[in-house]
């Protein structure tokens, strides 16, 4: 019986972000991508979300390397956290590694990591894997699909891709290489599902330039343009077209400044002589000659654009006559934040251009016709829709079945599923631990951690603090309990009444405990929490977090 090829996603299935896929053959492992996700609104105080890599820790001696598809943080952003535990070689294209190295340097890890540059022409062996790459178009330059040839068959991972026939840098998705792989025979394809609910084909990045020309021609004041800092092609178009219209540009936002400098130094960004000025110099130029490139297209509260909108930016004060262009689509979950920013910008007197009908954004992901084309080119025996919410995976799985693939050859995986593939069969044979790890300041914690639950409870129901002073010898109450409430009980009179009733209820229970000679700190804390929690719920239908403080004298 032949050894199976095993595919184990630890992130990126049924969700947007934290993409990380384990590929295993003959007891050896390569990892494709190592991404993070950004916290949802209910993840209070959380900075970042990482995939749980418990499985990789348990197999770290078998891991041969991490292969990166491209330079977006949902595909490489977890590297500084993962490499602390599993320090293995990292492979990626030139720009992808430049972004990754900058992130590693921030964490003091750059000198500790074995980093290897590859391109679409690279081919090498990692244990039982013959590793190759295919050039693909995406919203960040230098993106790659990954090809793993094994004795059992070939795996192709699309990464994020689309078929752009007129890309800004002239680097198209290599359909000839994909077709050759299809002719050779592909055992399994993992493909980007993000736009499986979008009919037709994704538009070319160059289309955005037409809208930019019109905006710069019509704008009488400054143009402030927000986009993803990694969308170097978008930034290139903005710089080039602004220059044609007689405008210089400045850059605002830490990640935008960093990525512009990296891309310029590596030759991915062409800046005309004299076109770039410092942000501190913008007052030296008339408004009609200025473009300001900024972060904040997702309405992030601390981003440069949000600070402009709320009149909190140290260099850029919003002025009537400004034209603000939001050249990005809100990531699911960010819609409210983006609209709040738009509202503030409009109140500040700016003209705001955003939304699909304006032509200022095209997606970097394959739509349904593109996905159908990839399936027809690669002709996989087994197909795994990846990188998307369940609805995206479902729709792309349905697309594969429409293309003639048998039902049992199209598999929708969940994070942690262990898919075992032989030449004739693919089935989930096991499950490993996979979930979310939260980055909270300098700490890492699991999604189930009590800290996060406490924050959610505080936000939803408030807190009740009870200070009880008792005799250490007898357990008798030495003073009336002090009870304070925050985050509920809005009416002052009702609040006073409820808290007094709560004190009376608590005193009665504490007297019972004293008569029974129960004086242990933990037992008293549990009783105080139970009595107050039950009483407050009965009187208010709220369940605040009860924090008992026992003072023994």
Where are these regions (language model features)?
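His/Asp/Glu-rich metal-coordinating catalytic cores
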Residues: 1-67, 72-285, 303-317, 336-340
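A glycine- and charged-residue-rich anion-binding loop/surface
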Residues: 13, 37-41, 62-63, 354-357, ...
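Short glycine-rich phosphate-binding loop at a beta-alpha junction
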Residues: 89, 384, 547
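Conserved hydrophobic residues forming the short capping helix/wall of the S-adenosyl-L-methionine
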Residues: 104, 400, 536
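Short Gly/Ser/Thr- and Asp/Glu-enriched loop/turn motifs at secondary-structure junctions
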Residues: 119, 414, 542-546
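Hard-cation-handling environments
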Residues: 197-327, 331-356, 360-517, 525, ...
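C-terminal tails and terminal domains of large nucleic-acid-associated
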Residues: 517-553
């Amino acid at each position: 019986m032949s050894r199976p090829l095993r595919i184990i996603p630890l992130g990126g299935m049924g969700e947007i972000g934290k993409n990380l896929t384990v590929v295993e053959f003959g007891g050896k492992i390569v990892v494709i991508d190592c991404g993070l996700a950004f916290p949802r609104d209910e993840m209070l105080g959380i900075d970042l979300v990482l995939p749980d890599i418990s499985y990789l820790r348990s197999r770290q001696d078998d891991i041969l390397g991490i292969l990166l598809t491209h330079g977006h943080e949902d595909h490489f952003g977890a590297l500084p956290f993962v490499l602390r535990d599993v320090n293995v070689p990292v492979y990626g294209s030139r720009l992808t590694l430049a972004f990754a190295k900058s992130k590693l340097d921030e964490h003091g890890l750059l000198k500790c990591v074995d980093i290897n540059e590859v391109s679409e022409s690279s081919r090498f062996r990692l244990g039982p894997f013959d590793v190759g790459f295919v050039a693909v178009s995406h919203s960040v330059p230098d993106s790659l699909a990954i090809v793993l040839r094994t004795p059992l068959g070939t795996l192709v991972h699309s990464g994020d891709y689309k078929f752009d026939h007129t890309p800004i840098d002239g680097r198209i998705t290599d359909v000839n290489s994909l077709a050759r792989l299809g002719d050779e025979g592909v055992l399994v394809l993992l493909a980007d599902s993000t736009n499986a609910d979008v009919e037709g084909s994704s538009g070319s990045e160059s289309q955005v330039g037409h809208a930019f020309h019109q905006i710069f021609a019509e704008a009488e004041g400054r143009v402030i343009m927000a986009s993803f800092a990694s969308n170097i092609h978008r930034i290139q178009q903005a710089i080039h077209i602004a220059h044609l219209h007689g405008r210089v540009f400045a850059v605002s936002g830490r990640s935008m400044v960093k990525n512009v400098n990296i891309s310029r130094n590596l030759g991915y960004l062409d800046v005309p002589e004299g076109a770039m000025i410092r942000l501190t110099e913008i007052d030296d130029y008339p408004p009609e000659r200025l473009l300001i490139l900024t972060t904040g297209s997702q309405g992030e509260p601390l981003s440069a654009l949000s600070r402009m909108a709320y009149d909190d930016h140290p260099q850029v004060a919003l002025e009537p006559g400004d034209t603000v262009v939001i050249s990005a689509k809100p990531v699911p979950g960010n819609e409210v934040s983006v609209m709040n920013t738009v509202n503030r910008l409009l109140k500040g007197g700016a003209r705001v251009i955003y939304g699909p009908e304006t032509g200022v954004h095209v997606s970097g992901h394959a739509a349904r016709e593109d996905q159908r084309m990839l399936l027809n080119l690669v002709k996989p025996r087994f197909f795994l829709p990846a990188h998307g919410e369940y609805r995206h995976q479902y729709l792309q799985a349905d697309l594969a079945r429409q293309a003639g693939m048998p039902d049992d050859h199209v598999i929708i995986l969940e994070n942690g599923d262990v898919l075992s593939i032989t030449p004739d069969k693919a089935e989930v044979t096991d499950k490993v631990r996979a979930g979310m790890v939260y980055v909270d300041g300098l700490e890492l914690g699991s999604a189930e951690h009590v800290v996060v639950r406490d924050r959610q409870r505080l936000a939803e129901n408030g807190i009740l603090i009870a200070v009880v002073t008792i005799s250490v010898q007898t357990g008798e109450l030495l003073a009336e309990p002090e009870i304070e409430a925050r985050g509920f009980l809005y009416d002052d009179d009702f609040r006073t009444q409820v808290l007094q009733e709560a004190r009376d209820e608590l005193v009665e229970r504490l007297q019972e405990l004293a008569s029974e000679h129960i004086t242990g700190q933990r037992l008293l804390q549990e009783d105080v929490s139970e009595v107050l929690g039950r009483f407050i719920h009965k009187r208010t239908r709220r369940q605040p977090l009860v924090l008992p403080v026992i003072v023994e004298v």
